[in-house]
Amino acid sequence: MEEYKGVWLKAGIIYALNLASNGFKPVEVGLGERDFYVDVESDTTLTLDEAKKFATYNQYSYQLKDGYIEFNGNKIKVLGEPSSLEPKYFEILNISVHHPSPNVQYVRIRGVGFEKKEELDQYLKWLEEVSEYDHRIIGERLDLFSFPDETAPGLALFHYKGQIIRKELMKFMEEINESMGYQEVFTAEIYRSILWKTSGHYDYYKDKMVLFKMEDEELGLKPMNCPAHILIYKSKTRSYKDLPIRFSEFGLVFRWEKRGELYGLLRVRGFVQDDGHIFLTEDQIKDEVKMLVKKTIDVLSIFGFKGDDVRINLSTRPDESIGSDELWEKATNALVSALNELGIKYIVKEKEGAFYGPKIDFDIRDSLGRWWQLSTIQVDFNLPERFKLEYIDKDGSRKRPVMIHRAIYGSIERFMAILLEHFRGKLPTWLSPVQVRILPISKDVEDYALNLLSKLKENKIRVELDMSDETLSKRIKKAYDEGVPYMIIVGKKEREEGKVTVRGRNNVEIRGVKFDDFLKALLEEIRNRDLNQSAINKLK
């Protein structure tokens, strides 16, 4: 079950009809159908009775093991006690055809069920809100990005205003990395397969890799940046005095997601990670992880994600993994020790670590009540072992370093999509592609408006001048709809007095403001990366 604004939902209900055996078509199944089953492709929780009912209905074999029902290679977590929730009000959300394999297809009916009608109505209203603020709609409306048919599926084109947002996010992360002592690097995107075989990606991640042959040699686009950073580490002899060595990169990676799973910027095949890799000694792990956890919490708070809206998880060894039990235990204990010393509560996610090491994940809850997994910190003893990394210790002996993988945004594209939906298209001023729009009341004050435009540009403010023939009220509405944080309205009176009228996106309007006072407050708001419109609040 999922939690939504304090209401417990029986969400994600699915009824799967095997077309191969009974020939049903999607349109033949209506709202009256009550045999709902849980999607076997997700890590969905259901009761033991529900699991048995699901498995009994289906013609395929299954078995219960370690609290999971195994079905056709998929696993569903089973609760020990039957649920007391018996939904009375259902709504069909989607009917589609699903092809899990070439010879099998299903009609999949997605729906939700609630005990009370008002809960169902509340949920449907929430769905409308989610749909309205879909980042794909916002991206098109604000001219941020597109997915033309001529590009490969899952690869976005970022327009001028969308690139501004990306650059601001990267600039902020560059400042964070510099404050933590990172060396920014740049690495290639194509590598010989021998690299991926050494790293283990070829055996454990091949299904998501883009591999191809050129001149009788197998090559691959990088799905992760870590092996490339390892090659930089190996390029010279390292001393214990050099450690920790921290590399950062805005690295473009490619992962071959299934076409049906692609979803705007949230699930793409090519994306930029705010990646970082730290090479260090074992006794440096705890302090480094603690610093990373604290810095991640600080960064997320800049975007308004703090307190109960941040959830920290510890993900342990998955079934498909590399390395010995001893190395996994050491890595997991290092993460646990750091979290405990910080006094941070965390949730253990069994078997959800990376194939090379355990990890700390940060989930955030957005303004629409949804949880998103973002930041990650991973301790890795295995890749240094596989690549035979070394450093010279105090006594002259050669020792194996430990490696920490970290990404705070996760990826620029996904984080940008989450922010667009979280802020509903109205980004904080420092992130907004257009920060100020000047609206002259008439053409008589065009010279004054142009003078203000020049001064704002001199101070690196992203500003536009709207001299269109539309009415002032329409131009104000247009600026508001486009998420412009501030409007400067000027008429004859403002020109004569050398002042401006400032109108905020929050509909606060202040007349007779000295331009220099507004500029000073605006620059301070941008410099501090304030969430709220602090500039106009200071002018009140």
Curated annotation (Swiss-Prot):
Q: Which Pfam families match?
A: HGTP_anticodon, tRNA-synt_2b
Sorted alphabetically, which SUPFAM superfamilies does this protein's record hold? Class II aaRS ABD-related, Class II aaRS and biotin synthetases, ThrRS/AlaRS common domain
Record-level GO cellular component terms? cytoplasm
Which cofactors, if any, are listed as required?
A: Zn(2+)
- What is its subcellular localisation? Cytoplasm
Q: Does the keyword Ribonucleoprotein apply?
A: no
Q: What is this protein called?
A: Threonine--tRNA ligase catalytic subunit
Keyword Ligase appears in the UniProt entry: yes
The job of this chain, per UniProt, is described as:
Catalyzes the attachment of threonine to tRNA(Thr) in a two-step reaction: L-threonine is first activated by ATP to form Thr-AMP and then transferred to the acceptor end of tRNA(Thr). Also activates L-serine and transfers it to tRNA(Thr) but cannot deacylate incorrectly charged amino acid; unlike most archaea the editing function is found in a freestanding protein.
- Biological processes annotated in GO: threonyl-tRNA aminoacylation
State which gene encodes it: thrS-cat
Write out the ranges of the annotated region (Catalytic).
Answer: 134-428
Q: HAMAP family per the record?
A: Thr_tRNA_synth
Q: How is the cofactor bound?
A: Binds 1 zinc ion per subunit.
What is the similarity comment for this entry? Belongs to the class-II aminoacyl-tRNA synthetase family.
List the source organism: Sulfurisphaera tokodaii (strain DSM 16993 / JCM 10545 / NBRC 100140 / 7)
